[in-house]
């Protein structure tokens, strides 16, 4: 008999008491030697059924283990075999099969990073199970296992995971990524865009230095306008002004964009810089 614990719609379910009875009967009648494997198996069984009892679970349905990733521990990984991201474990007379990809997703989503660390401790590459694990970790702000992966210089299939880091203002982790990996200029540019859109002035200050304003003034002006239009963060706007950009550029385009997008804090700041813009504001609101 197989008990398939996956999220693909094809799983069976079983009554908890029935499953416990089956396992106990098999152990009593067919298991003669109390080996290390048998001891670990019994520990797994005891932990699973203790969890079911604690949470008043009477029927084991699809995904019960994958959806509760704390159940995937060292013993389960030691005794099971992994093939194409699926963990299979024989607990006679049943075989439990767990979708580790779903387990990783739920582990990250619900801030239970223990599973990722266990996989790494067991030299099991989580990237082979979930190729987007870096992005998952950065999106859900699970930085401890992410930093561990970066320090290991783990395989990275796509550096899009740095963009949530920029949006969240995690400059130190971005710098760590750049220490271990070579990021293309295009990626750096997108990091800056995310920082500008989300008001992360610490990241803007790090990448858009005085030298950047001297060597690429048109690009800096583009960032300035985009920041007003799509971000609207006053701290970002002030940074660009402090670096030498002015509101009179391109026939007062910064003022017009701020007026059209109703950036009141920015307009107030611009008015403090130049109170002659009042008519421009009126014409563009």
Curated annotation (Swiss-Prot):
Coiled coil: none annotated. ANK repeats lie at residues 99-129, 157-186, 188-214, 215-249. InterPro entries: Ankyrin_rpt-contain_sf. The keyword Repeat applies. Keywords: ANK repeat, Repeat. This is Putative ankyrin repeat protein R551. It comes from Acanthamoeba polyphaga mimivirus (APMV).
């Amino acid at each position: 008999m197989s008990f398939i614990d996956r999220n693909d719609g094809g799983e069976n379910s079983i009554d908890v008491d029935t499953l416990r009875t089956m396992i106990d009967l098999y152990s009593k009648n067919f298991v003669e030697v109390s080996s290390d494997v048998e001891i670990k198996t019994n520990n797994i069984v005891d932990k699973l059924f203790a969890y079911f009892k604690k949470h008043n679970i009477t029927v084991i349905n699809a995904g019960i283990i994958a959806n509760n990733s704390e159940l995937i521990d060292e013993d389960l990984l030691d005794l099971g075999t992994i093939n194409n991201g699926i963990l299979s474990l024989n607990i006679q007379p049943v075989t439990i099969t767990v979708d580790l990809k779903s387990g990783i997703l739920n582990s990250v989503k619900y801030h239970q990073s223990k599973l990722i660390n266990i996989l790494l401790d067991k030299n099991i590459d989580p990237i082979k199970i979930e190729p987007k694990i870096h992005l998952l970790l950065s999106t859900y702000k699970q930085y401890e296992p992410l930093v561990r992966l970066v320090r290991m210089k783990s395989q990275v299939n796509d550096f899009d995971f740095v963009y949530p880091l920029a949006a969240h203002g995690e400059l130190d982790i971005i710098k760590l990524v750049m220490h271990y990996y070579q990021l293309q200029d295009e990626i750096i540019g997108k990091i800056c865009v995310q920082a500008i859109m989300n008001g992360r002035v610490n990241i803007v200050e790090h990448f858009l230095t005085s030298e950047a304003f001297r060597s690429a003034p048109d690009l800096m002006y583009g960032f300035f306008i985009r920041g007003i239009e799509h971000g609207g963060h006053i701290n970002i706007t002030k940074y660009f002004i402090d670096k030498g950009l002015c509101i009179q550029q391109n026939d007062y385009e910064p003022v017009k964009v701020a007026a059209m997008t109703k950036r009141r804090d920015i307009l107030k700041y611009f008015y403090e810089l130049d109170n002659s813009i009042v008519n421009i504001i009126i014409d563009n609101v």
